[in-house]
């Protein structure tokens, strides 16, 4: 059974801090577009996502045949694994669990590069030494989930070069990239055509609060690999509502700009309050905060109607590590009030 954030079904929580979607909510234009798509539910979706493909290629300034769509980023991860069929997969740890879930489908052996707490769980240059010819595939979440740490472009290029030298396929998960203060400084999007062994993973889920619509995509300049991915993907995996919603979302530039402005301000506020309450707070760069507290904090919050993400099931983490998303100020004030109540007994 998968264990992720957002486990609200069958429970009654008044505030869900366990999922990292944009707290500003789904844009109204996206909701209306999805509704128009739902009205066409008697039809099969466009298997090639033509309108969405054209809009996204223009938005990212890339070629249309460099995009593969999926039913969320997780769907693209599984398709990439099935297409490459790696025998050995390397990931930093802790990181997003879905990479390992997908690797199990092809019975790949997992290798982990354990990130050190004394280094704030940052990926260091020692990772390059692990990129040897016996590794077939690498997944790199940037910024990382759950730690929020981000790898800068110079280091990403060094990793991509080493992977290219040793025949390793590199998947860089940039699903949280838009939440960084300078997204381009932490992205390989501009280097897509330089590396045939590179795929960038992105989704509409987090930035546009579209988790329930399921729309993710992979970007890659290797045409043969993209064709293989298409063979490994189920047809009609992207619904009409999701395709319509994606086209509408790409027009919401003002919504994204305002969201990022709010999230950065509230992230500073929340980090400061967590530190004031005595928690060990790490340098998370995205729309969530990674921190250390008493192992029973999730239970204590749950008893007060608030769900937070217990990270103890992540490889490389012991009990006592948690992740919370950044929400609107009124909600963040309530979280702080509850945490203060717990701390003060």
Residue spans of the language-model regions?
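Conserved PLP-binding catalytic core of the aspartate aminotransferase-like
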Residues: 272-305
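Conserved PLP-anchoring active-site segment centered on the Schiff-base-forming lysine
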Residues: 83-104
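PLP-dependent aminotransferase class I/II
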Residues: 25-30, 197-282
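Active-site phosphate-binding strand-loop segment of PLP-dependent enzymes
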Residues: 111, 117-182
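Phosphate-binding glycine-rich loop
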Residues: 49-89
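Short acidic capping loops at alpha-helix termini that bridge into adjacent secondary structure
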Residues: 63-67, 167, 174, 196-197
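PLP-dependent enzyme catalytic core of the Aspartate aminotransferase-like
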Residues: 303-304, 313-345
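N-terminal "arm"/small-domain region of PLP-dependent enzymes with the aminotransferase-like
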Residues: 1-43
């Amino acid at each position: 059974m998968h264990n992720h954030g957002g486990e609200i079904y069958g429970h009654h929580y008044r505030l869900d801090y366990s999922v990292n979607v944009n707290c500003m909510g789904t844009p109204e234009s996206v909701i209306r577009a999805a509704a128009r798509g739902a009205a066409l539910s008697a039809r099969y979706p466009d298997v090639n996502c033509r309108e969405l493909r054209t809009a996204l290629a223009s938005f990212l300034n890339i070629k249309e045949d460099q995009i593969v769509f999926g039913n969320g980023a997780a769907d693209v991860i599984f398709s990439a694994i099935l297409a490459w069929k790696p025998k050995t997969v390397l990931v930093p740890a802790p990181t997003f669990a879905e990479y390992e879930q997908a690797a199990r489908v092809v019975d790949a052996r997992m290798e982990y590069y354990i990130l050190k707490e004394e280094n704030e769980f940052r990926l260091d240059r020692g990772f390059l030494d692990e990129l040897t010819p016996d590794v077939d595939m690498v997944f790199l979440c940037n910024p990382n989930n759950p730690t929020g740490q981000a790898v800068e472009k110079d280091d990403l290029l060094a990793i991509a070069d080493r992977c290219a030298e040793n025949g390793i396929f590199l998947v860089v998960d940039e699903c949280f990239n838009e939440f960084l203060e300078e997204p381009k400084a932490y992205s390989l999007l501009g280097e897509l055509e330089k590396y045939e062994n590179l795929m960038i993973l992105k989704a509409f889920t987090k930035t546009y609060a579209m988790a329930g619509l399921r729309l993710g995509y992979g970007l890659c300049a290797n045409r043969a690999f993209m064709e293989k991915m298409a063979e490994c993907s189920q047809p009609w995996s992207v619904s009409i509502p999701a395709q319509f919603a994606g086209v509408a979302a790409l027009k919401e530039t003002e919504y994204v700009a305002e969201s990022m402005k709010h999230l950065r301000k509230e992230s500073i506020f929340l980090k400061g309050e967590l530190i004031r309450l005595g928690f060990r707070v790490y340098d998370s760069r995205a729309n969530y905060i990674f921190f250390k507290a008493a192992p029973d904090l999730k239970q204590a919050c749950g008893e007060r109607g608030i769900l937070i993400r217990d990270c103890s099931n992540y490889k490389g983490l012991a009990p006592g590590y948690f992740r919370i998303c950044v929400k609107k100020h009124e909600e963040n004030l309530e979280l702080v009030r509850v945490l203060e109540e717990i701390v003060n007994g």
